[in-house]
Each structure stands twice: as structure tokens, then as C-alpha cells.
């Protein structure tokens, strides 16, 4: 079950076999997993029985500014869900500022560009959010971030390849990133 808000996260912990978080921010993963785990415990379940999947854009390369621009669409997509959370819980409610602060500059969102690199409706998304929500940088940067996520309890990582380096990124995952992660700590 995927979710961002406290109610959806608690429901996930109570009944779901798995939790999908559509962003790769370690802080927000920890925050989300607290709700999932607390609800699982309250329901008499082992919180570790709820498998965790992080799904986010991955872009391997050395030009971070270009990667930010290519993956900024994702912050806009997440921003749509965050806007709903702010409407429900308030700007300074249960949802951390690390998730809500950036949408203050959000204006109208045109779904005609949804999920596409270069989406003009996502200009409000700062580089910092793109970097936190996605997995960007060199092969070594990807390995480091994925290791952090794994240490926090992520069982599976799903990459989105909606940018101009699909083949290169996929090749890097197949040839370098996945083998390095498997060598460090086989599952």
C-alpha cells in the first residue's frame, strides 16, 4: 500500500503486507515508517512483517544541475499529494516541514505535462527537494544512498527512468550498482 499521510500510513501498518513510499528521502522514510510500525504493533503485528519499497527516479551521471532539471517533475508529482495532505492536516500539523515547505510556491499544476522531464508546472520545486526525493549523482552516490535506505529497512527499490539517460542509468544499475549492493550485503 502506498501513502504519505498519517492515516494512510497507519492503515498500512494495520493491514498491509507492504508499504510503498514514492520518494527516497531517508528522513521522510523514517518518519513514515514510525507510523507504519506503531500501527502494526498496535494491531498485534510484527512491524518487520511489513515489507518496504521505495520508488523514485534514479539518474546516474556527473552533472547534478542537469539531473535536477530532468527529475524535477517528480517533486511536482509528489507536490500534488503533499498539497492534499496540507489541506487535510494543515501546514504545520502532523506532516513534517521537510515534506510540506516546498509547496508554498506551487501554483496551478497542468496534468498535461505530468511525469515528464521539463514539466513547466514544476518550477517551484527546489534542487534540494529533487536531490532528497530522487537518487542522483555518480554510481558511488547511488550506492551510498541505497545503502542508507537499506539500513533504514527498505527491502526493495524501484527506479523511475523518466529522463534523458534511461539506457545509461539502467546499464549502470545492472553492471555496477546492483552488483556492488549485493556484494556488500547479500539478501
Name each model feature, range by range.
Residues 4-40:
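Loop-centered beta-sheet repeat module
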Residues 1-2, 19-21, 50-57, 157-159:
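Hydrophobic faces of well-ordered beta-strands that scaffold small-molecule active sites
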Residues 23-26, 158-171:
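Glycine-rich, proline-tolerant flexible connector loops at the mouths of alpha/beta enzymes
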